[in-house]
Amino acid sequence: ALATVADLYKERRGAALGTYTACTQSGSLLGPFLGGWLAYTAGFSTAFVTAGVFGCIAILIFFRLHLDEPPPRVRERGLAPVMAEMGKGFLAVARNRKVLITSSTDAAKMVANGALMAFLPLYGLSVGLNAGQVGLLFSVQAVTSFLSKPVMGRVSDRVGRQPLILAGLLICAATFISMPHVGSFALLLVLSSGFGFGEAVVSSSSAALVADSSEFKRLGAGMGMQGTVMDIGHASGPLLAGLLIAHVSYQGAFAVIAGLQILAAIAFWATMRTLSR
């Protein structure tokens, strides 16, 4: 789906991909609320049937777009030709340094995101926040990210992807490292909102840059590689944070993970500067 959006909007990829990721995020925000309400008021069957109906509606809308499909690149029948083409696509993307370094910035951001999801609730409770306040921290982060992605995508179309990726990583690092030094609910709200904004800046710009840096015939492979690297980062965040918190402290753990984001920003800047020569 990301590759389709990137292919349709070549001139306004930042805005288009920012809007796309915001829409997917709105689904993840609305799903638990709507599903929980339906399960409570009408039962699990109604909740799951409703989810299925929404999925069918999405399929119908997609097919009504009547998109022009490129001819298949693999004409031979069987699994072997398909696997061979997949291997070629993976190798081509793996050699693309722009795609790899850009994906690594998303991974660094997602390490912090995963760590926040796992341990911000525990930290919040340890400084005296209640469960409702902890939930509001995540809501503010998600809403800020949701509202910022389309806007920052448009900005990246005008000013370029690279400066925004660097700025977003630094914002994420600064807000992330500050959280375990704060016990005030109001300040934690500000920091959570700031992290959500930085996350939106990185996500909208990095997706567009990966699309810009991928060959047309490898666009899907490039976007897939970015998604895989992001998922690895997101899954690694709780594990890394847990090990660090167990051996040092919240402050030390958050400092190390913030340092990873700064290192990713430096590596991204240095690599892109080298490749542009």
Predicted regions, residues:
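Structural signature of the two symmetry-related core transmembrane helices
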Residues: 52, 163-178
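Pair of pore-lining "gating" transmembrane helices in MFS-fold secondary transporters
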Residues: 95-112, 193
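Core transmembrane helices of Major Facilitator Superfamily
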Residues: 1, 194-206
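Helix-loop-helix hairpin linking two adjacent transmembrane segments in secondary transporters
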Residues: 20, 24-63
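Juxtamembrane intracellular "pre-TM" segments in multi-pass secondary transporters
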Residues: 69-102
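Cytoplasmic helix-loop-helix junction between adjacent transmembrane helices
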Residues: 1-24, 208-209
